[in-house]
């Protein structure tokens, strides 16, 4: 087992240094354990000072479960959401209490997935129903801008050299290691406040030599002394020791930003006019060398630039000032960021307005001055806001004052009345349309009935014509074998169909026929009688 794990603190009270920070964390954890939700914690400080250890000890002492994720390793939106986003909204299945979510190195979210990763972290913080502890190495990182307002920030300081030295002595005593006190103190000092690094270095020395001396320190490399940029500026302005300043200038940052930061804070620290003049002369020489480096692409000029802005500015003062001076960021960057915000806002507004006005955003940008006049009237401003669908921040581009709530209320009531009238008109129109449809249906039905009756009359007339025609044809064609009864029936049917002029003829004809038939019948009877008599 490595010594870092072997001699790691077993409870929160065992952690070295940062007593105030530990007390704040304990208060936060107590409130969560009592069921009072708190803002997520954001622990900020250099590596190796116990942030992660404290987070895990809090999880062990106060919560039922701990889930950890390194945000800099899992940078995309989907990965962060799936790994910790879902866990933040659900309670533990197997334990009753809250589960602690630990997100390490949130300031390390970078690369192409940056926007997605940062968005996932922000959404997790916003929607979480579980306690969250976030950790960052650089408290001044721009990547924490959106996270800081949502969290309770706690700053951690480096562990004091004496505290590290005492811990190393305890480890040596337990491991039965002989040591030179001066060598051990040098090791503690060179760890630069990083307790973890000091313990790891001690273990590396012991693996090579069972005794710690000044010579044994050569086994390990001096801890990379990359400074925080604000510590660098403090060293340049406060110190007169060239070696100390040179050590402080070992900072991983862009020279143009560093030169601006030093130049901004010179008049805040230096009080004598001649000191300020000399310091700015050094800044000017540094700037000349930076310009040469960028112009010729020969970056060896950078070392001269660092020499002038570091040792040169430090040497400009006759004595150090024992006062507190707050280091501020260059005003030029503040102004640029403000103007960038304004530019972005202007771009958003012109994009929205161009869609409605059917003109290019660039052309519209020239006309924004005239809209400022239109936005002076409250009611007109409200109408324009609604028409272009502008937010309150976007309205500020045209007017400093917010549109009064009374105007909004008045316009809303007016709009509601207009909507009601419009609805009534729509209902009326619907009724009119329905009546029109009914009338159309009625006229259509009437037309259909007319057409049908006309068709029926035509069919009836055609039928009667066909029957009369068939009767005429039957009369003209003679029948060969027709009985007298048939003839009589035919004659009767003929009598019915014939006109009144022929009715007298037919009646006389029938009477003659009747007489003939009666005579024949009499003859038959007489024959029959004669036969019987015979």
From Swiss-Prot:
Q: Which InterPro entries match?
A: AAA+_ATPase, ATPase_AAA_core, P-loop_NTPase, Rep_factor-C_lsu, RFC_lid
Q: Which GO terms describe its molecular function?
A: ATP binding; ATP hydrolysis activity; DNA clamp loader activity
> Which segments carry the region annotation Disordered?
444-534
Gene3D superfamilies named among the record's database cross-references:
1.10.8.60, P-loop containing nucleotide triphosphate hydrolases
> Where are the disulfide bridges?
none
Instruction: Give the transmembrane region(s).
Output: none
Where is this chain compositionally biased, Low complexity type?
488-510
Q: Where does ATP bind?
A: 45-52
Give the similarity note.
Belongs to the activator 1 small subunits family. RfcL subfamily.
Q: What is this protein called?
A: Replication factor C large subunit
Give the species: Methanosphaera stadtmanae (strain ATCC 43021 / DSM 3091 / JCM 11832 / MCB-3)
